[in-house]
């Protein structure tokens, strides 16, 4: 690769680092999991972080055995995953 190509690559990597929000680097990996209602049949309102939309969304939670990306309140979801 030529020195010009290396400089371009270095510039792009630097730009990526600057534009990537600090919070996404520190966000727990479980925040990337999909909404998981679990196997139970309850109808509870819960929240999960949607990494594509970059926000917390409502979903119906069955009441048991969901993944860690399940929160009782939108505030808790935002504090942990969307900060």
Curated annotation (Swiss-Prot):
Stretches assigned to the BPTI/Kunitz inhibitor domain: 31-81
PROSITE patterns reported in the protein's UniProt record: BPTI_KUNITZ_1 (PS00280), BPTI_KUNITZ_2 (PS50279)
Name of protein: Kunitz-type serine protease inhibitor blackelin-3
InterPro entries: Kunitz_BPTI, Kunitz_BPTI_sf, Prtase_inh_Kunz-CS, TFPI/VKTCI-like
CDD domains linked: Kunitz_textilinin-like
Record carries keyword Secreted: yes
Function per UniProt: Serine protease inhibitor.
GO cellular component terms, A-Z: extracellular space
Site-annotated residues for Reactive bond for chymotrypsin: 41-42
Cellular compartments annotated: Secreted
Family as reported in the entry's similarity comment: Belongs to the venom Kunitz-type family.
Expression sites (tissue/organ): Expressed by the venom gland.
Alphabetical keyword list: Disulfide bond, Protease inhibitor, Secreted, Serine protease inhibitor, Signal
Source domain of life: Eukaryota
First and last residue of the signal peptide: 1-24
């Amino acid at each position: 690769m030529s020195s010009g190509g290396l400089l371009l690559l270095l510039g792009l990597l630097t730009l990526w680092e600057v534009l990537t929000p600090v919070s996404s680097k520190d966000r727990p990996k479980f925040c990337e999991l999909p909404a998981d209602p679990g196997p139970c049949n309850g109808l509870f309102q819960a929240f999960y972080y949607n990494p594509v939309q970059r926000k917390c969304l409502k979903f119906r939670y069955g009441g048991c055995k969901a993944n860690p990306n399940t929160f009782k309140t939108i505030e808790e979801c935002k504090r942990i995953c969307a900060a």
